[in-house]
Amino acid sequence: MFDEASEGADVDALAARIAELAGFESFFVAGSQVSAFLLGVPDNGIMGLRDVVDHARHVASSTNIPIFVDTDTGFGNALNTYHSVQRLERAGADCIQIEDQLSPKRCGHFQGKEVIANSEM
């Protein structure tokens, strides 16, 4: 489980390495931060799977602590989400967060989000 005292959260490989050296037990790669860092845009569904997989690979290769990766809505339907999880596992993600929003998603900090039906879960 997430514990603020044991988990670092930031965006890049250097921050993950610093978190590890500071004694954090895990590192969270937040989608909103990656979107801002890589593309300079809000977390509104612009990032693609390749962006997230490549970034996760860089972060995972820089540290020995588990990384948790925000995958937004999984990049499509259930089959796309399955494929996304496989790609992120191969990239080194230890845990994956998948939002239950309809696609295209809205940034989690904003109002007006819609979630998928329970049957989709």
Could you tell me what each predicted segment is?
Residues 6-12, 27-29, 67-71, 96-98:
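Hydrophobic faces of well-ordered beta-strands that scaffold small-molecule active sites
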Residues 15-21, 69, 75-87:
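Catalytic cores of alpha/beta
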Residues 5-10, 74-80, 114-121:
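Active-site glycine- and acidic-residue-rich loops that bind
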Residues 40-69, 91, 109-121:
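Alpha-helix-loop-beta-strand connector modules within alpha/beta enzyme cores
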Residues 30, 34, 91-93, 98-112:
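Active-site-proximal loop/short-helix segments
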Residues 17-36:
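N-terminal glycine-rich anion-binding loops that anchor highly charged ligand groups
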Residues 1-9, 13, 17-22:
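N-terminal amphipathic alpha-helix/helix-capping segment at the start of soluble metabolic enzymes
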Residues 11-13, 32-33, 72-76, 101-103:
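Active-site beta-loop-alpha junctions enriched in small/polar residues
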